[in-house]
Amino acid sequence: MENFLEQAFGKNDVTTPKMRAAVREWFDLYYGAPRPQEDTALRPAALIVGKLCRTVFAEYEARLPADTAPARKASLAALDRVAKTALQYAMIGGECLLKPVPQKTGFAFAALRRDCYVPLARDAHGQLLAVGTMEILSVESRRYALLERRTAGADGLTIETRLFELNGQTLGRCVPLNTLPVCADLVPQLVLPGVPGVGLAVLRMPLVNCVDGSADAVSLYAPATGLLHALARLEAQLNTEFANGASRVFASEDLLRPDAAGQRALRDDLFVGLPDDPANVGVTVYSPALREQSFLNRKQDLLRGCESLLGLRRGILSEQECSGEARTATEIAAAAADYDVTVRELQGAWAAAADEAMQLCAVLGSLYGNDPHPAAPLTVDW
């Protein structure tokens, strides 16, 4: 996508290489992408995101004044429908964009996760000044790329749109927008006066960048990335421990015979019933003792480390009561307070993004004519 946007608009991704690698790593951790010497079946990143999202929206209610126009209320209802998805995308990638999509009355919203758009310019505070997106469209046997570049300016928002017919893995040639019926109403360049920023509501995680110190937002579990990989490696080692602990019977190598596939194995007729205890007739059975408790203790240490780094309540990931760990009432209260602060910060981030989205609906509704009403105050209860 970065190369296509660069070819179409002559702009590069301003994200540093270190941050781009970190974003890929966060999504790999969430989706359990396979890595050498790791067992990703545990998916602790998905557990963290899922539990926090349910806690944040447990008693959520957003409302507008009773006399608000129906179109604006419809927009808020559409925003609520993508709320949980958007927050989870933001927790995974650090940032999620909420794109208002004009409807006959009001707006629907699309949640754009961090790996689905390219920041083309940011200010010193990390706010987007230009952003690029791409949508792949398929018509019969042909594939098209709809590229969009949004740029914030003093005169308002400028949206540039290009449609390309893909040639294999290359961008191909630029074709008119009316080539596809779904793009027939689009124009190559559109200026929307009075629209703030890039015309997208931004949901950012309230964490300082711990990857490269840039203005980019980071994943909620970015500080614990190393521990999450250590957990996956430990799980793979534990699996190996159980595999190596299987009972085995030792036999002389000269008893092995090749089978039809060329693999050496014991013949079935070598195994006969024994009338006595195998230990009394000279057969050696290998059944080693497992060391799983050491691995499980280490696993709990890593999980508690994740909880401490991410401000989670003890027991969210690890076992709540662990033998050998004495905790005072002050420590327990401090952990609960950290978790409460974490949840409140996430609630505040969503409330700010929701308010920004409603403000955009007021501005865009006046321009498009599908919601020509002034902005109404949004109230969010938790």
What are these regions (language model features)?
Residues 368-382:
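Extended amphipathic alpha-helical segments with heptad-repeat/coiled-coil character used for oligomerization
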Residues 75-83, 223, 227, 294-298, ...:
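Short amphipathic alpha-helical segments
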Residues 307, 362-365:
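Residue-level preference for well-ordered alpha-helical positions
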Residues 333-349:
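Glycine-rich and small/hydrophobic secondary-structure elements
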Residues 1-128:
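Extended, helix-rich architectural segments
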Residues 97-213:
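Extended, regular secondary-structure scaffolds
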Residues 70, 303, 358:
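Generic structural marker for isolated residues within well-ordered, non-membrane alpha-helices
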Residues 182-334, 378-380:
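Extended, charged amphipathic alpha-helical segments
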